[in-house]
Amino acid sequence: LENTRKAHLLDGIAVTKFMYWLKKNVGKIPMDEVSVSDYLQSLREQMEGYRDISFDTIAGYNANAAMMHYKAEPDTAAKLEPQGMLLVDSGGHYDTGTTDITRTFVLGPISDIQKKHFTMVVKSNLNLANVKFLYGCSGISLDVICREPIWKENLDYQCGTGHGVGYLLNVHEGPNSFRWQYRPGFDNPFEAG
C-alpha cells in the first residue's frame, strides 16, 4: 500500500502541474485534445521512477468527453477554448505502482445543465468517499451508493464506477469491479491485502 501511495503522490504532482498550466494558458496559446495529452505525459515523464503511461490518455473536450474511451487524433482533435469542460482520463506506471485517474476541468463558462450534472458527479464521489462498509462488502453495493445522486435525477452512466488496478500490469485488472449489474466471478468482496 505504501508504494501505491507513493505512485499516486508522484502522479498527483504531475497532474497538479498540468492543471495549473491548463488554467493559466487555455485561450492564450493554441491547444487541442492531443497537445494537452502530450503535455501531461511530458510532466509524468519528469517524475522519479516513471516507466510509461498506464493506458492511452483520453482527453475529451465538451461533447467528446461524453464518449467512453474516446481517442483524439491529431487531424480531428478538438481545439480547446476558455469555455466548457475537458475530461482527462489518464495514468502512469511508476516503479512504485500504477495509477488511473479521471479529472474534469472547467475551462470557463458552462451551462446550467453542465453545472447540475457536474454537481451530481461530485455528490456521487463524496458518497463513495464517505461510506463506511463492512468486511465482505462487494463492488455492487459500493456502485449503487455512488450512483444514488444520479439515479435520483433519473439519469445513469453506462460504464462501471471502478475497477481493480494492476501493479505495473494491466490498468484494468480483474476480477474486481464496481458496477451495479451482477456478473458472476467479477465482483469479489473487498479485503485488506
Language-model-detected regions and their locations in the chain:
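Active-site neighborhoods and metal-handling regions in enzymes and metal-associated proteins
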Residues: 1-193
